[in-house]
Amino acid sequence: MPLLLTGRTFRRDLEAHGCLAVHAPLEGGAETRLLRRLRGAGYRTRLWSARGLGDPEVFLTQKHGIRPPHLGHQSVGRGAAVGEVQEVVPQLGDLLDGDAQVALWLLEGQVLSQSELRSLCDLCSREPRLRIIVEMGGARSLRWQPMSGLLAS
């Protein structure tokens, strides 16, 4: 498996397209090998689950509000009609500091809608240092394609 030894082809495709859809073997290991190769090439990497991502662009790049779980407690006039809102810093804020390339690997990407996947592609085109890999399901062997190609079909 020369791909897992070097990762050059994967890195070239990632740099050319910006956003890739990956089908990885279910036993795992491929994502960490490729992330290790990307780190060796100078990328700053992060591995996240796509579940609970919400609006991907806002979650990743902007300061946004979240509501903590209710847990059955009564509020005694401490919040608005919609409940307490806490402000959260952007998740990619610290990674985008500096000049290094950033690679974000999203697990369980099959739960994302078409519009969310399109917004991830748009985010990659607006931020030239950001590369996003979305795991779209399992396969017997590692394969990938540009996200734009997946969305077109």
Curated annotation (Swiss-Prot):
- Membrane-protein topology: Peripheral membrane protein
Q: Where in the cell is it found?
A: Cellular thylakoid membrane
Per the record, what are the reactions this protein catalyses?
a plastoquinone + NADH + (n+1) H(+)(in) = a plastoquinol + NAD(+) + n H(+)(out); a plastoquinone + NADPH + (n+1) H(+)(in) = a plastoquinol + NADP(+) + n H(+)(out)
Keyword Thylakoid assigned: yes
Q: Specify the domain of life of the species encoding this protein.
A: Bacteria
Signal sequence span is none
Q: What is its EC number?
A: 7.1.1.-
Ribosomal protein as UniProt keyword:
no
Question: Per its UniProt record, what Pfam families does this chain match?
Answer: NdhN
Per the record, GO CC terms? plasma membrane-derived thylakoid membrane
Q: Name one GO molecular function term.
A: oxidoreductase activity, acting on NAD(P)H, quinone or similar compound as acceptor
Q: Which UniProt keywords apply?
A: Membrane, NAD, NADP, Plastoquinone, Quinone, Thylakoid, Translocase, Transport
Provide the top EC class: translocase
Q: Which family does it belong to?
A: Belongs to the complex I NdhN subunit family.
Q: Describe the function of this protein.
A: NDH-1 shuttles electrons from an unknown electron donor, via FMN and iron-sulfur (Fe-S) centers, to quinones in the respiratory and/or the photosynthetic chain. The immediate electron acceptor for the enzyme in this species is believed to be plastoquinone. Couples the redox reaction to proton translocation, and thus conserves the redox energy in a proton gradient. Cyanobacterial NDH-1 also plays a role in inorganic carbon-concentration.
Summarize subunit and interaction data from the UniProt record for this chain: NDH-1 can be composed of about 15 different subunits; different subcomplexes with different compositions have been identified which probably have different functions.
**Official protein name in the record:** NAD(P)H-quinone oxidoreductase subunit N
The species this protein belongs to is Parasynechococcus marenigrum (strain WH8102)
Taxon lineage: Bacteria, Bacillati, Cyanobacteriota, Cyanophyceae, Synechococcales
